[in-house]
Design a protein with these regions (language model features):
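Proteins that catalyze or organize thiol-disulfide redox chemistry
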Residues: 1-100, 104-160
């Protein structure tokens, strides 16, 4: 139903606008310490989060571990809203821990070529991009606007 879709989009836009002042305070300022080549613009990785690489994603998947891929950038307002409103909530973090989900975060702040290639492989030209790779089964691409319920529903094992 288009009306529901427009309603959700409008709600997301209003939430982003309400959070914009606080999010801009967290964004890197021009002239601030430049991001390093290995870990551009984002703050330190949260506990339980690792830096993204396709090799690490393959290794975790081959070991039967569920993986949540979070492709983001310091300048991406949608990414910042999703982090605050969906990914970093107590409920989402508790579910990630409960199901043993490992998060791999890719920082595209300075357009990392390896991340660009990964995005293109999945038909995307930019961030945010979210991918859940279950321990067994096909990967699931999540929408660009997240909610805690959507993330938790996606990572919850359906074979239990």
């Amino acid at each position: 139903d288009c009306t529901a879709l427009y309603g959700v989009a409008l709600l997301g836009l209003l939430a982003a606008m309400a959070l914009l002042p606080a999010l801009l305070e967290q964004a890197p300022q021009a002239g601030a310490n430049p991001p390093s080549a290995s870990g551009p613009g984002l703050s330190a990785l949260p506990s339980g989060t690792e830096a993204f690489s396709e090799e690490r994603l393959r290794a975790l998947h081959n070991a039967g571990k569920p993986v949540f891929v979070d492709m983001t950038a310091a300048w991406c307002i949608t990414c910042l809203v999703n982090e605050r409103m969906a990914l970093n909530t107590q409920a989402t973090q508790a579910a990630m821990a409960r199901y043993g989900v490992i998060t791999l975060r890719g920082d595209w702040t300075q357009r990392n070529p390896a991340i660009t290639a990964f995005l293109r492989k999945h038909g995307r030209d930019g961030v945010p991009f979210y991918l859940f790779v279950p321990a067994h089964g096909a990967a699931v691409v999540l929408p660009q606007i997240l909610t805690p319920g959507l993330v938790i529903g996606t990572i919850t094992p359906h074979d239990k």
